[in-house]
């Protein structure tokens, strides 16, 4: 069963807020901007992560230095799963944040 529009927006909002909270609590020097449903994380080295919602197909998209990734929400797992690699969003963010900033952060709740 496909996510309802309201459920999709609630999930993306909660995910983006969790990402913001993790970066806020990390002490890492980042700029966070959340505007019109797009969350941008800018690292002090100029690289960035961009989280956007694709409402018509109910996906969360992540743009990073290493590429673009599309995530579907798995209700059974309660996680966002990459549609090309089956990697969980939290696992991918650990790897990408390390690659782009050199910092090891935990994204277990994602």
Swiss-Prot record:
Name of the protein described by the UniProt record: Iron-sulfur cluster assembly protein CyaY
Function comment: Involved in iron-sulfur (Fe-S) cluster assembly. May act as a regulator of Fe-S biogenesis.
PANTHER family attached to this UniProt entry: FRATAXIN, FRATAXIN, MITOCHONDRIAL
NCBIfam families: FeS_CyaY
Family note: Belongs to the frataxin family.
UniProt keyword list: Iron, Metal-binding
Biological-process GO terms, alphabetical: iron-sulfur cluster assembly
GO MF assignments: ferric iron binding; ferrous iron binding
Gene Ontology annotations for the cellular component aspect, listed alphabetically: cytosol
């Amino acid at each position: 069963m496909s996510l309802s529009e309201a459920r999709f927006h609630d999930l993306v909002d909660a995910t983006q807020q969790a990402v913001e909270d993790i970066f806020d609590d990390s002490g890492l020097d980042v700029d966070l901007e959340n505007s019109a449903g797009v969350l941008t994380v800018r690292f002090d080295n100029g690289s960035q992560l961009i989280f956007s919602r694709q409402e018509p197909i109910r996906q969360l998209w992540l743009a990073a230095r290493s590429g673009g990734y599309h995530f579907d929400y798995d209700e059974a797992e309660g996680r966002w799963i990459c549609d090309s690699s089956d990697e969980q969003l939290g696992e991918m963010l650990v790897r990408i944040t390390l690659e782009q900033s050199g910092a090891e952060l935990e994204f277990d709740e994602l």
